């Protein structure tokens, strides 16, 4: 379902508090952790979130 990079980015985000309120890290921090550009990390997160939500909610 998720690409390896999407899975890696979302795992880091969940593990390090990206989805906590308030956030414990930014997408820039996710990018640094997975060694990619911030815009790429944001794209990985958005695509992973979309795929995961579609699997829960359906089409």
Segments (PLM) and residue ranges:
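Acidic, polar-rich N-terminal leader regions of halophilic archaeal proteins
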Residues: 1-59
């Amino acid at each position: 379902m998720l690409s390896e990079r999407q899975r890696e980015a979302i795992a880091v985000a969940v593990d390090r508090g990206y989805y906590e309120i308030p956030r414990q890290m930014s997408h820039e921090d996710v990018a640094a952790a997975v060694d990619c550009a911030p815009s790429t990390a944001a794209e990985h997160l958005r695509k992973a979130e979309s795929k995961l939500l579609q699997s829960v909610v359906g089409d």
